[in-house]
């Protein structure tokens, strides 16, 4: 069975992963069929590049992504796009839906950032108040 999974590269304490299509019996960093993307978890925010056409090809031929790779693919919107294609939607519908999805993701990121900012400010205010007393 073919799996789409992470292959670790990089150096000690600074991981860099290649997203590869590989036989499930092959070792993690061993033989693979094709490199379909890269993932750099140490970058802020995490850097993910995926060859969408190759990932969709491998998934249509039966390759199963691992849990981590599935979440990375989901974060790029490719799973949503593949689902729409499997439902037989037209290209115009898919494009419109993906734009809507992208806008929704941007709004969610902004909300999360606003919550983090409020929490930081509240923590600083509490520390300043504690320092006065």
Swiss-Prot record:
Compositionally skewed regions (Basic residues) per UniProt: 109-123
Gene3D superfamilies xrefs: 3.30.1320.10
Keyword Ribonucleoprotein belongs to the record: yes
A Pfam family that the UniProt record links to this protein: Ribosomal_S16
Extent of Basic and acidic residues compositional bias: 124-133
InterPro entries, A to Z: Ribosomal_bS16 (IPR000307), Ribosomal_bS16_CS (IPR020592), Ribosomal_bS16_dom_sf (IPR023803)
Name assigned to this protein: Small ribosomal subunit protein bS16
Species of origin: Chlorobium limicola (strain DSM 245 / NBRC 103803 / 6330)
């Amino acid at each position: 069975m073919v799996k789409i999974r992470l292959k670790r590269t990089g150096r000690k304490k600074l991981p860099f992963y290649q997203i590869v299509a590989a036989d499930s019996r092959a070792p993690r960093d061993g033989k693979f069929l094709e490199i379909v993307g890269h993932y750099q978890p140490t970058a802020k925010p995490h850097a993910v590049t995926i060859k969408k056409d190759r990932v969709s090809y491998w998934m249509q031929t039966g390759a199963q992504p691992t849990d981590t790779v599935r979440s990375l693919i989901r974060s790029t919107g490719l799973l949503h796009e593949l689902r729409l294609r499997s439902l037989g939607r037209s290209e115009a519908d898919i494009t419109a839906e993906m734009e809507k999805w992208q806008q929704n993701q941007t709004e969610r990121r902004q909300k999360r950032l606003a919550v983090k900012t409020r929490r930081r400010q509240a923590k600083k205010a509490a520390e300043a108040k504690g320092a006065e007393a």
